[in-house]
Amino acid sequence: MFIIIKHGDNQEFLVNSNCSVLLLLHYIRKKMKLRKTDTIDLCDESGTMKLLFLSKTPGDSASKFLTARNTYYVCKVERGAPGTRIENSYKAIVPMLKNPEPELVDSLRTQCDFLERSRIKMLRTLEAKRLAAMESSVNLPARSPKGGGAQQTTSTSSQLKSKGGRSDEDGPPSTRRPFYKTRADFLKRHR
């Protein structure tokens, strides 16, 4: 289950894809002397990205996403500047090749635009849900009595009655305890 990774000036190396996505990306970064914080991905020869960097479960086997004996290019995913409002935006996806084909660059640019539009759409959806939740909690309708509030003829003594049928005038309700806390309590009471 090997794949060919091409980069730079027509350089290539073999990678065993029978490992986790996390380990595969780590190995490629190390082999190409990239920083650990660099976001990279692989694309096939037609420019279709594999989106390994977006994997929800990086422990999954990379062979699920990659075809054995195929050639893949390393691409660097450029995001917004850290600490800014556009920190998570997709700025560009750049193939790590000296002279990439124009079709490859166009395909990656199209996919980058699509990723950014999807990210913005998701943010707008989340913001709309958050606003709807806030509005519904702020604008809760006040409950009014069924009779309209004008006809309230309950006596004060019936208002003082609790669920047990006792009135508050009888004193505080007795504390209710479980019959038996432990097996020892049960045996004490029945001997």
UniProtKB/Swiss-Prot annotation:
Domain of life, per lineage: Eukaryota
UniProt-recorded Gene Ontology molecular function terms: RNA polymerase II cis-regulatory region sequence-specific DNA binding
UniProt biased composition (Basic and acidic residues): 182-191
Low complexity bias (residue ranges): 151-162
InterPro entries, per database record: CXorf65-like
Coiled coil residues, start to end: none
Location of region: Disordered: 137-191
GO BP term (any one): gene expression
Record's protein name: Uncharacterized protein CXorf65 homolog
Native species: Mus musculus (Mouse)
